[in-house]
A protein has these predicted regions:
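Activation targets extended, charge/polar-rich intrinsically disordered C-terminal tails
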Residues: 106-188
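A general marker of short, structured functional hotspots
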Residues: 7-10, 40-41, 46, 96-97, ...
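Second-shell loop/turn segments in exported
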Residues: 19-22, 92-98, 113-122
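Short linear sequence elements within intrinsically disordered, low-complexity coil regions
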Residues: 16, 50, 55, 105-106, ...
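Solvent-exposed, acidic/flexible segments
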Residues: 24-28, 72-75, 99-106, 120-128
């Protein structure tokens, strides 16, 4: 298994149009997926109702590559820089909460991220479920939580509860924290 990594990202304060009488809400968040190849090559994708018909469209953002440490992980400073850019360009300047996945196959995730996707559906295929599908393609042995509430915020929370490291980024302070995580049983 390739020693690449990925972040299942949520922007928890992102204002989402529910297309109902409720209007906009910040209770569900918006999600994307950050792919980091073992050599530092970095790609970011998100899925949403960006097209006029609101059927769903994959967007990618140009971001800098990560600097990689001797143990194969992105440096904290390069990850902080990437998350700062994503907060501004994809998260409307809001906070980021992410589940960190290790030992995933970059090329398989990239293929999943860029292929034709099902039609957007708030319950059965939203931005969070898209990002999750990309990561699961990178390692089918990842422990999958039972997700009853498929909002982007909840999907990320469930994967953190499964033992993936929690990554927090505050655009206000510029601070990043990366938890330990214990997902080794599913990463071999």
């Amino acid at each position: 298994m390739e020693n690449s990594s990925a972040l299942l990202i949520t922007y928890p304060d992102y204002p989402v149009n529910t297309d109902t009488f409720y209007g906009y809400t910040t209770l569900v968040g918006h999600a994307g997926v950050l792919l980091i190849k073992s050599n530092g090559l970095t790609k970011y994708y998100e899925f949403g109702r960006y097209d006029p018909a609101k059927n769903g469209l994959v967007k990618n953002r140009r971001i800098p590559n990560a600097q990689i440490t001797s143990d194969g992980k992105p440096t904290t400073s390069s990850l902080k820089n990437i998350l700062s850019i994503l907060s501004t360009e994809s998260g409307k300047g809001g906070r980021i909460i992410a589940a960190y996945f290790i030992n995933v196959d970059f090329d398989k995730m990239l293929a999943q991220a860029t292929k034709a996707q099902p039609k957007y559906d708030i319950k059965s295929f939203n931005c969070g479920q898209y990002a999750e599908s990309v990561i699961l393609q990178g390692n089918p042995r990842i422990d999958r939580p039972l997700i009853i509430n498929p909002t982007p915020n909840n999907i990320v929370d469930e994967y953190i509860e499964e033992g993936n490291a929690e990554v927090l980024f505050s655009p206000t302070t510029g601070e990043i924290s990366i938890g330990e995580g214990d997902e080794s049983d599913a990463k071999n």
